[in-house]
Amino acid sequence: DEGCLPDDSSRT
């Protein structure tokens, strides 16, 4: 989910 979810910014 790269850039799919807003929380993804934390997963980089």
From Swiss-Prot:
One GO cellular component term: extracellular region
Tissue spec. comment: Expressed by the venom gland.
Transmembrane segments: none
This protein's record includes keyword Cell division: no
Annotated keywords: Hemostasis impairing toxin, Platelet aggregation activating toxin, Secreted, Toxin
Subunit structure: Dimer.
Job of this protein: Snaclec that binds to von Willebrand factor (VWF) and induces its interaction with GPIbalpha (GP1BA), resulting in platelet aggregation. In contrary to bitiscetin, it does not bind to the A1 domain. Instead, it interacts with the collagen-binding A3 domain of vWF. Also interferes with the binding of vWF to collagen.
Protein name per its UniProtKB record: Snaclec bitiscetin-2
